[in-house]
């Protein structure tokens, strides 16, 4: 179905050939994903000919056995891949003048190699915006995978909370989370590098886990996600290890209130900027606006960051079927940081999260 949309777009826009270069986008159109490393892995679609998947011989049998039921063309390391691509295209069609290229995944070296095979062709049309647009709206089968990834994230939080004890490093907690995901859930890939930040480290939103040790009576921020059959989860929770101070409780409750208000307000027809403003106003009115230093959210799907961007000034209208995060944060340098994040799908009834770990402030007991 997705590939039909691409072929229809080619016909409507007077394009002869589509060059799809990102492994994630190839997965979207074919149901097959692999890491080709330095080798060539591409999808070619045509306005009036059958598409084909081009891959290393190492991946040929895997591709043939995948959900992709179209042609697969493999090549050996000893062969010239670009010459073989050109030969395959010229056998399929005489129309290869006008190309639509996924420029977001195109390297200069690959463009030069392709242009050398088709020196008279026009490669100026960008396919990236069309791909981003159709990926905005998730099908029910995609939502099933996103919900499953959310369940895995909820499991990971419980492992992380249980791993906290005096003197444990942030990295050791991460290792426990990722080990148990593999052992108990069969999760072989996280959607990004797992973040665990204790105390003042949590005031640096995207700082990775360090050898910093967890100490009693501080906040600990978790930001984590998994890949489930090619679809990502991404969720954040902040907990207290030991008894938090009144100030810690205050910033937590302000942030939790802002996040829940945005979840409750989200509906089709409002703009991304309006939704961002719901949470931002609450945090600003509480006196912490200067510490909310990022957008409210981002799209999610086959990649952990997709469109739409839920940001101040973005007037894109939110529609049913869009999936995105709602994740306000308050980060006070030298003190603490709080982020609470859920990804979900926008329906006519509102925003439906994929993760369900409680957002009441969890005060964990101190353990030796």
Curated annotation (Swiss-Prot):
MF term (GO), any = metallopeptidase activity
Q: How does activity depend on pH?
A: Optimum pH is 6.0.
Q: Which InterPro entries match?
A: Creatin/AminoP/Spt16_N, Creatinase/aminopeptidase-like, Creatinase_N, Pept_M24, Peptidase_M24B, Peptidase_M24B_aminopep-P_CS
Which keywords fit this entry according to its UniProt record? Cytoplasm, Dipeptidase, Hydrolase, Manganese, Metal-binding, Metalloprotease, Protease
Its predominant location is cytoplasm
Give the CC-aspect GO terms.
Answer: cytoplasm
Q: What is its EC class?
A: hydrolase
Q: What binding details are noted for the cofactor? A: Binds 2 manganese ions per subunit.
**UniProt binding sites for Mn(2+) 2:** 223, 234, 341
Where on this chain does Mn(2+) 1 bind? 234, 298, 327, 341
What does the UniProt entry say about where the protein is found?
Cytoplasm
User: Do the record's keywords include Cytoplasm?
Assistant: yes
Q: How does activity depend on temperature?
A: Optimum temperature is 50 degrees Celsius.
An individual GO BP term: proteolysis
The EC code for this enzyme is 3.4.13.9
Q: Please list the reactions this protein catalyses.
A: Xaa-L-Pro dipeptide + H2O = an L-alpha-amino acid + L-proline
State the Pfam families in the record. Creatinase_N, Peptidase_M24
Identify the cofactor(s): Mn(2+)
The free-text function statement in the UniProt record for this protein reads: Strict dipeptidase active on Xaa-Pro dipeptides, except Gly-Pro and Pro-Pro.
Q: How does it assemble?
A: Homodimer.
What family is this protein classified in?
Belongs to the peptidase M24B family.
Entry protein name: Xaa-Pro dipeptidase
- According to its UniProt entry, this protein's organism is Lactobacillus delbrueckii subsp. bulgaricus
